Amino acid sequence: MSEGTVKENNNEEFNAYHTLTTEEAAEFIGTSLTEGLTQDESLRRLKAVGENTLGDDTKIDYKAMVLHQVCNAMIMVLVISMAISFAVRDWITGGVISFVIAVNVLIGLVQEYKATKTMNSLKNLSSPNAHVIRNGKSETINSKDVVPGDICLVKVGDTIPADLRLIETKNFDTDESLLTGESLPVSKDANLVFGKEEETSVGDRLNLAFSSSAVVKGRAKGIVIKTALNSEIGKIAKSLQGDSGLISRDPSKSWLQNTWISTKKVTGAFLGTNVGTPLHRKLSKLAVLLFWIAVLFAIIVMASQKFDVDKRVAIYAICVALSMIPSSLVVVLTITMSVGAAVMVSRNVIVRKLDSLEALGAVNDICSDKTGTLTQGKMLARQIWIPRFGTITISNSDDPFNPNEGNVSLIPRFSPYEYSHNEDGDVGILQNFKDRLYEKDLPEDIDMDLFQKWLETATLANIATVFKDDATDCWKAHGDPTEIAIQVFATKMDLPHNALTGEKSTNQSNENDQSSLSQHNEKPGSAQFEHIAEFPFDSTVKRMSSVYYNNHNETYNIYGKGAFESIISCCSSWYGKDGVKITPLTDCDVETIRKNVYSLSNEGLRVLGFASKSFTKDQVNDDQLKNITSNRATAESDLVFLGLIGIYDPPRNETAGAVKKFHQAGINVHMLTGDFVGTAKAIAQEVGILPTNLYHYSQEIVDSMVMTGSQFDGLSEEEVDDLPVLPLVIARCSPQTKVRMIEALHRRKKFCAMTGDGVNDSPSLKMANVGIAMGINGSDVSKEASDIVLSDDNFASILNAVEEGRRMTDNIQKFVLQLLAENVAQALYLIIGLVFRDENGKSVFPLSPVEVLWIIVVTSCFPAMGLGLEKAAPDLMDRPPNDSEVGIFTWEVIIDTFAYGIIMTGSCMASFTGSLYGINSGRLGHDCDGTYNSSCRDVYRSRSAAFATMTWCALILAWEVVDMRRSFFRMHPDTDSPVKEFFRSIWGNQFLFWSIIFGFVSAFPVVYIPVINDKVFLHKPIGAEWGLAIAFTIAFWIGAELYKCGKRRYFKTQRAHNSENDLERSSKHDPFEAYSTSTTLQSEINISVKH
C-alpha cells in the first residue's frame, strides 16, 4: 500500500497488523522505524485523516429535540386534548395537560443531554500528550496531532494515545480493562507475529497496544496504526453515536422501494410507532387508532344532523371525540413510573430512563460481563498441589483479602489429576489442615518440609502485601491481584512476607495476628531472610524470581514462580519420587505434572508453578555469587520444582442464587467475557449459567453453548441464526462480539438486557433493550450509556429490577384497562345518546363535555395512580416474561375493555332513561346543550343521575381490575372471614381506597354547588335520582362480577382440556432440559410405553 492510500483512509480497511513483522508494518504504513515521519509528512497526514480525537463535542439542537418530543402520537393526542379543553373553556384540564406536555419535553431534553455526556466522557479518556519520534528526534506533541506512521514512545503511567504495532517492549504491561473488561494487566511482546490464517481476538493481540489503555509496567515503542474513530476505542465511540437509520439506501432495492421504506420509517418515528420501548410503541399505535376513531365519531355526530353543523352540533362532536381520548393516561403513566423509579432506589437500582422500567418486564435474556459483575473481580487461591505431599483445597472464602476466612483441607498424597480420576470415592480428606499442620497431626508418610519449602517460596517470590487496616478493621491488600491471592494464602497459613523479611506493611496487624511459624523460626531481633536481588516478571519469560539470604542457616536461596511452561523449563529436579530426596526431572515426570496443570485449568483456574534452589557460601565464590545475583539465566537454572497453585476470580456470593431465580422466571443468562474459555466455562457452570452435566448433551449443543469470540465472529449471520442454541458463554470476546450477540438475540425476537461495567460494554449496553451498568466499579461511559445503574454492583439486584418491571407492567395493564374501558363506555353512551332529540330535532347531550372531561381527567386519574401502586402478585417471578410483541394489549385485556365498557354503558343509559322517563316527565326541551331554561329541567336532572352513575361505575371498575380474574370479594382466600377478606381487599392499597372514596364524595358538590352545576357541568341538583344512580352502580358491580365468573369458568375449562401442556408450563424445569439427550431418550421411552 502506498503512503497516499494510507493517508487517505487511515488504514481503516486493514486490521491485521498483528500478523505483520515490525519491518513489514513500517513498510506497509510508510514510515521509518528509526527516524519516524518528517514534519511535512505528518502535517500532510494530519490534514488527510483529521485529528486524533473521538469527534467534536456533540451539540444539542434544542429546536429539533422539542420538535421530536412534540411530534409523536401520544403527545399529539395530548395537544389535541389541550386544545379541546381550552375550546370548551376548561382551563384547569387544559392547564394540567399543558403541564404534562412540558414535563415530557423536559425529560427529552435531559435524556438528550445525558446522551451527549456519554460521548464526551469517552472523548476525555484519550491522553492529552504523546511522545513521538519525528525527523529522528523525540518530541512531545498534543495527542490529537498523532497520525498513522508516527513512532510513539510510552512508559509507566502513560495513557496510550493511539493503537500501536509495538516494535520494542521492555517488561511492558498494559491495563486493557476498558476494551476487554478483564482487570488483570496484559503483558505485551513486540516480537510476536500471529498467523494470518488464525483468528486472533483483540485481547489476544499481544504485539499491539490500544488507544486509551494505561501502561502499568515497563516501557515500549510502537508504530501508530490507527487513530481517532478507527482505533478500537474509537469503534466503541462510533457505535455510541448511533445512527437514525431512517433513510433506506439498500442497493438491492429500487429507488421507489427505498423511498417507500424511508417514508414508513420517518412517519413511524414522527408518530412514535417504531421507536422507544414496546409499551410506548403500543401506546403510540393506540393513540393513532383512537385519534382516527375520534375523528370518525365526530363525523358520525355531524352526519346524524345531516351535516347541519351549528355551534351545539360542533360541541357535541367534540364531546364524542374527546370521550375516546384517554387524556390522563400519559399523566398517570409518567407519575407511576416516577414513583416506581423512587421505589427502585431503595432496592439499589437507579433508573436513568423511565421507559426501561416497563421494558424490564419483557426481558427474556440477560447478557452479562463476567469480571466484576458475576464475579468479584479479585483473585483467590483455590487449589495447591505439592508433589508427594498432596492437594490443598481452600473453600468457603468470601472475602479475597481476609486470610481468616475459609476452610483449608488436605487430600494427602493425591494430585488433582489423581483425585479427579479416582473412582474409589474415599480419598481421606483431612479438614482443618492448618491446625493439623502445627499440631503435627498429619499422616506419617508425608513430609511437612515439602509444604514448608513451597510456602516459603510462595511468600518470598512475591511483593504483594496483605494487612488489616486499624481504622476500618478490614483486611486490605496492595499489589498485583495474582500475587495478592498467593500472599493471602501465605498469611492464612501464618507465614506472611513481612514475618520472614522483617519488613513493615502499612497498618499491619498487631502481634496477636503474627504467625506461629514465624515465631518459631525467627531469631529475636533479626529477620530470617535478607533480600539480595530480584528478577521481575517479564512478558517474554513469564516468570519472576527473588534471591534471599537466610540468616538462620546461612544459605542463599532463589525462589521463583510463573507460568507452568516457563517455570518447568528452568527445573532439573523435584521431590516427586519419594518426597524426601531431590531426584532428576524426566520427560515422564514433566508429563505427569502437565496432566495436573490441565486438570486445574479445566476447573477454570489460572495455574502458576513454583521452584527454588539453595546453596551455601562455601559452594560459590564472590564472582559466582555476583553472576548469580545479576544474571537471570544463571539464577533461574537448575531449580527444584515444588508445586502448583490454581487461583481464580470467585463468583459473587449471590450470583448462583440470582441465576437460578432468573431461570425460574423464564430468563436465560449469557456470559460474555474477555477471559479464557476454560475459566469462563468453569465459572459459568459454578453459577448455573451452564449445566454441569455437559455429557448429557450432544456435541453440537455443547459447541453452541460455549464459544470463543473468534469462533462466534467467524460465523455469518445465517450461520448464527442456524445454531440450535445461542452461546451461553462467549470467551475472549471483543466489544463488537457483544454487539453481534445482541443483534443475534434481536433476530430471534428476544428482548434482552445487557449488564456491564467497562467502557468496552458501552456499545452493547446501548444496543440492548435494557442496558444495566454497575454503579461502584462501572465507568462513567457505561453508566451514561445504560438505562439502569445498580448502586451496589450486585448481580442479584437485577432481580429487584426485573420484579419491579414486571410489577409495573402488570399495574400499567390494570390502569390502561380501567381508563380505556371508561373511554369505550363514554363513547358508546354518547353515540347511543344521538337518538335523544329535543323539540327542535337536535340531539341532546346525555353527558356534557365538562362531565366527560371530569370523569376522564379528575375522577379516573387518582384511582389509576392507585392501581399503579399495587403490590406485586405472589407468583410474579414464577411466570414467563411478558410478550414484548403483544405487550399489555393481550386478547384478554381487549375483550375486558369492551365487556366492562358495554356493561357500564348499559348501567349509565339505564340511569339516564330511568330518571328521564321514570322519575321525571320525559321532556327533552329545547336548546339544552347550551344554557339552562325551564324546558331543560328533566334533561339536566337526568344528566346528573347518569354523571353520578358513570363516576361511581368508573371507581368500582378500579377495584375490579386489581385482579383480572378473581372476584373482588375473594381476593385473599386465605382469610378466615368473608368480612375480614372484604376489608382487606379495600384497605390493602390505601392510596386506591382514598382515591375511590374521594371520587365517590366528589360527585355531590359538583351536582349541588350553584353556578358550577348548571353553568359549567350543565346539570341540576337531584333527589330520588340518587337511588337510581346507586342501584345501577350496584348493577354494574354485579355485572362485572358475573363477567369475571364466566371468565374463570372458561379458563378452568381450557386448563382441563390442556392439562398436560399446563402442567408442562407450570413446572419449574431445568432450563437446559430441552437440549439434553437424556431427556430426548426419556421422551422416546415414554412414547413407546404409551403405545
Swiss-Prot record:
Q: Which cofactor does it need?
A: Mg(2+)
Segments of skewed composition (Polar residues): 503-519
So what family is this one in?
Answer: Belongs to the cation transport ATPase (P-type) (TC 3.A.3) family. Type IID subfamily.
| A Gene Ontology term for the protein's cellular component | plasma membrane
Binding of ATP occurs at T371, E483, K561, R606, T673, G674, D675, R732, K738, N760
- The UniProt transmembrane annotation reads 64-84, 91-111, 283-303, 313-333, 816-836, 849-869, 886-906, 944-964, 992-1012, 1022-1042
The miscellaneous annotation reads: Present with 606 molecules/cell in log phase SD medium.
Q: From the Swiss-Prot or TrEMBL record, state where the protein is found.
A: Cell membrane
Sorted alphabetically, which PROSITE patterns does this protein's record hold? ATPASE_E1_E2
**What residue ranges lie in the Cytoplasmic compartment?**
1-63, 112-282, 334-815, 870-885, 965-991, 1043-1091
This chain belongs to which protein, by name?
A: Sodium/potassium exporting P-type ATPase 5
Q: How is it modified after translation?
A: The active site is phosphorylated in presence of sodium or potassium and in conditions of higher pH. Not phosphorylated in presence of calcium ions.
Query: What positions constitute the catalytic site?
Result: D369 (4-aspartylphosphate intermediate)
Name a biological process GO annotation.
Answer: intracellular calcium ion homeostasis
Q: Where is this region: Disordered?
A: 499-525
Gene transcribed to yield this protein: ENA5
The answer to whether UniProt assigns keyword ATP-binding to this entry is yes
Report the membrane topology from the UniProt record. Multi-pass membrane protein
Q: Which reaction does it catalyse?
A: Na(+)(in) + ATP + H2O = Na(+)(out) + ADP + phosphate + H(+); K(+)(in) + ATP + H2O = K(+)(out) + ADP + phosphate + H(+)
Entry EC number(s): 7.2.2.3
The record's top EC class is translocase
**GO-annotated molecular function:** ATP binding; ATP hydrolysis activity; metal ion binding; P-type potassium transmembrane transporter activity; P-type sodium transporter activity
Instruction: Summarize the protein's role.
Output: Catalyzes the hydrolysis of ATP coupled with the export of sodium and potassium from the cell. May export potassium less efficiently. May transport other cations such as lithium. Sodium/potassium efflux ATPases are involved in salt tolerance and maintaining the membrane potential across the plasma membrane in high salinity (Na+) or alkaline (K+) environments.
Instruction: Please indicate the ranges of residues that lie on the Extracellular side.
Output: 85-90, 304-312, 837-848, 907-943, 1013-1021
InterPro entries referenced in this protein's UniProt entry, alphabetically: ATPase_P-typ_cation-transptr_C, ATPase_P-typ_cation-transptr_N, ATPase_P-typ_cyto_dom_N, ATPase_P-typ_P_site, ATPase_P-typ_TM_dom_sf, ATPase_P-typ_transduc_dom_A_sf, HAD-like_sf, HAD_sf
Q: Which UniProt keywords apply?
A: ATP-binding, Cell membrane, Ion transport, Magnesium, Membrane, Metal-binding, Nucleotide-binding, Potassium, Potassium transport, Sodium, Sodium transport, Translocase, Transmembrane, Transmembrane helix, Transport
Keyword Protein biosynthesis assigned: no
